[in-house]
Structures are given as C-alpha cells and as structure tokens.
Regions:
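Helix-coil boundary and interhelical linker segments in multi-pass alpha-helical membrane proteins
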Residues: 1, 63-78, 112-133, 184-198, ...
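Functional transmembrane core segments of multi-pass inner-membrane proteins
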Residues: 104-157, 169-172
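Intramembrane alpha-helical segments
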Residues: 39-126
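Small-residue-rich segments of transmembrane alpha-helices in multi-pass membrane proteins
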Residues: 40, 88, 103-118, 135, ...
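Acidic (Asp/Glu-rich) catalytic motifs at the cytosolic membrane interface
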Residues: 12, 16-35, 140-163
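Extended hydrophobic alpha-helices typical of membrane-associated regions
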Residues: 194-251
Length: 251
C-alpha cells in the first residue's frame, strides 16, 4: 500500500511543481509565444491564475498524505517533507539564480530516495546514495537540456541558469556526462557487489542515451532547433532507466 501511495504522491508532485514553475515563468516573461516547450499559458489555453490555483490545490493532498505518513513512520520523515516543500515553493526563485539543477537533484533524487528508505525500512540506509547518483543525474539532465535550449530566451528574460553560466561547449559535455555516466556507475556498483547482476539490464537504456548525446553534439553546427525536444527525449530516457533499475531489484 505504501508503494502505491508513494507513486501517486510522486506523480502529483511532478504535476504540481511543473504547474507552479510554469506560472512564474509566464509571469516573469520567461515563457512567451516564441519560446520552446509547453504552451498552456502562452497559447491562452489556460489563464495564469488557473495554473497557480492548480498548483496550490495539488499541495493540499500532498501535505495530508505526508502528515499521515509521518504519524505512521516517525518525525524524521517530517523534515524530509519540509525540505521538499521548500524546494517546490522556492524553485522558481532559485532557478532564476542558477540553482535550478541543484534543487532538482535534491527534490527529485535525494529527498524521495531517503524518504522511501525511511518509510519502508524505518531508517535511513547509507547504500541508497548509490541509487541517488545515477537517477539524479539523468533527472537533472532533463532540466539541463531545457536550459541549454532556452539560453537565448532566458537571457532576454534577464534570468540566470547554470547552462548560461557554463557556456554551450561546457553544456554539451555536462549533458553527455549526465546521461552516460549513470550506466558506468551501475556497472561499477555491480562489479563491486553493491547492486545485483540484474541491474545490468539498465544497460538497455544506453542506446537512447547515446542517441541523445549525439543530438546534443550537433548543437554547434545545426543550432538550437536540433535540441528543441531533447528535454522530452531525456525525460523518456529517465523513465526507461528508472523502470529498468526498479525492476532489477524486484527480480
């Protein structure tokens, strides 16, 4: 029951945080008619207040479930929830100051993994950090692909992202590291006995990872258009990787 509930809360969190971020991006002028990505606001499909209210409304069930889990498990889970809430609320402000990648790694890799460890085992297991690294890197790669593509429009909006500060050449190599290193990490952990041999099934995901990396390499010659949907492709890679990785621990 816990696993199903955690999955539902995780899905709700993604929708909520996306709506919250979209609202502030539109209000700040980051998202306009000519920007890439989701156009729910820039197209006029929804009003800004509708998106904001959706995000706030989705926070209510998350808080209720979180408090219920705290009662069932223990106070340490409360601090994980508080940190997660702060990451969600402050994300727009932090991402405009080049901390977006860091917040995503914390909110979508560190906190959920530690939380699940505590809920299922009743304590924080140090070995979960071995899981956090590969999953977190690919998750951050989604944002990095997005920010690399949006450098031009982000400059116009007068915000700062890690992609802007690093520059395109470094962005390319960082993205390649984020999507390829996790597979090397898995192989090393298997060889050292930390993960079961079944974890090598995740290597199936290296094919789309290589394809994504090659797409990013084409950026200097072919321009921003070539990575227009690379964030979506990276999200699919993350889903495939996470599913395969999860299955290997269930076999």
């Amino acid at each position: 029951a816990y696993e199903i509930l955690i999955g539902l809360v995780g899905s709700e969190m993604c929708i909520r945080d996306s709506a919250w971020s979209d609202y502030f991006d539109f209000e700040r002028g980051v998202d306009r008619v000519d920007t890439f990505g989701v156009k729910t606001l820039t197209s006029g499909q929804f009003m800004p207040l509708e998106i904001r209210n959706l995000a706030i409304g989705l926070m209510v069930p998350a808080v209720m479930v979180g408090l219920w889990l705290v009662v069932r498990t223990g106070l340490p889970l409360l601090w994980i929830g508080v940190c997660g809430a702060l990451c969600s609320l402050l994300y727009p402000w932090l991402k405009y100051r080049a901390f977006g990648d860091f917040v995503i790694f914390v909110a979508y890799a560190i906190l959920p993994t530690l939380g699940i460890s505590y809920i299922t085992m009743g304590k924080f297991l140090p070995d979960v950090w071995l899981i956090i690294v590969p999953v977190g890197l690919i998750t951050v790669a989604i944002l990095h692909a997005n920010n690399t593509r949006d450098i031009g429009t982000d400059v116009r909006a007068r915000i700062s992202t890690l992609a802007m500060r690093l520059g395109v050449k470094t962005d390319i190599f960082l993205y390649m590291f984020e999507v390829l290193f996790p597979f090397l990490w898995i192989a090393a952990c298997v060889a050292l006995g930390y993960f079961p041999w079944w974890s090598l099934l995740t290597i199936v995901g290296i094919l789309p990872a290589i394809a994504n990396a090659r797409t990013m390499l084409r950026l200097p010659k072919e321009g921003i258009g070539v990575i227009s949907n690379l964030d979506e492709k990276t999200a699919k890679l993350q889903l495939l990787f996470s599913l395969l990785f999860t299955v290997t621990f269930l076999i």
